[in-house]
């Protein structure tokens, strides 16, 4: 059955037997933060969840994910982190253009953009300084990879790839299906 996290509530005395969630919950909240904290509540009650809190917390944060991929010798674009607007601008200048800036937390390609020159870098950094999100004060920059207009999404269970698809750009920089890319 379907559980709507938006209308479900818990407290510190909540017990598994008070809910009819079945044997395991497949967490698929659209909101990362809602899903993460909903998972924490379910795990608090010893309800098995896919994906577990630790997995969702790690994979939902691009900075942590990038560091773990690197630590495990998985090739990724060169990635830079900085924690102030000034240092981010210095990184742009020292590393050179083009780079891609991404929010450390986010999905659907939102706020992911190529930065090809100093004027664009300054505008992007200035825009992030007026937002209220604390994660916007962490600057995640990646080298821009010259690649075909597609990426590959792979679904794994344990160490086994069980499904994969190309996501082909519909003419832009991003290959996200929510933004119009075509699955194949």
Predicted regions and their residues:
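Phosphate-binding site of ATP-dependent enzymes
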Residues: 113-184
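Surface-exposed, flexible loop/turn segments at secondary-structure boundaries
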Residues: 33, 57, 87, 162, ...
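ATP-binding N-terminal substructure of ATP-dependent carboxylate-amine bond-forming enzymes
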Residues: 1-55, 64
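Short, solvent-exposed loop/turn segments at secondary-structure junctions
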Residues: 31-32, 106, 146, 169
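Active-site nucleotide/adenylate-binding loops and adjacent lid/helix of ATP-dependent enzymes
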Residues: 18, 43-46, 51, 56-140, ...
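Short hydrophobic/aromatic-rich motifs at helix boundaries and adjacent loops
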Residues: 36-39, 59-61, 94, 166-171
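Conserved residues at the C-terminal ends of beta-strands
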Residues: 28, 82, 167
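Short, contiguous strand/loop micro-motifs
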Residues: 25-26, 52-53, 75-76, 182-184
